[in-house]
């Protein structure tokens, strides 16, 4: 059986797009930023990664240079800040089971027990997560393992969102929060047990996989990124 692509949980397959009306050529080392131009107008497309430890900062200089030249940044989605109580409640409600159902109803006893065993490493239990749908649980597992591997971090998108807010740069978004919630809520629909069980099986590989992906991303090694993220699956 083909494994569910955990790599797609751990790194951004999507792009953050930075645009500026008038930008000259940017001389830089190879990294994951590409320029599309017509006349004096240019759009810079930056490949981003959502899990990036603090040790990976500062970012390659091209990211900063491109940001400084840009007047508008276009991100994947605007996620609610931790202080946005209404937004956080909306996410939690959209990713939780309703009508008395729980994760126990969608996974086998064996998988539920395996989840319990894994969560015991963090002083938690499967029952504490059972209110959430499998997509949310799987993403939480990846975040927890990244934290344990000392690889957790805010990521490139969040970093530039903060800079844009600080500097008063315009920000736009490709997707709505409702779309993101729906996508995550329906992740693994019909294959809930497989999603959780294979996520648990793949977590031990996360540290090495993330390190390889981050290295390829920093170097703009699209061939290696294809190998890690696309060709493998």
Task: Give names to the regions the model predicted.
Residues 24, 32-233:
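Structured, acidic catalytic/metal-binding patches in enzyme active sites
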Residues 20-27:
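Bacterial Sec-dependent signal peptides at the C-terminal "C-region" and cleavage site
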Residues 1-3, 15, 23:
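Compositionally biased, intrinsically disordered low-complexity regions used as flexible
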Residues 10-20:
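Bacterial N-terminal signal peptides
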Residues 2-10:
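Bacterial N-terminal signal peptides that target proteins for export
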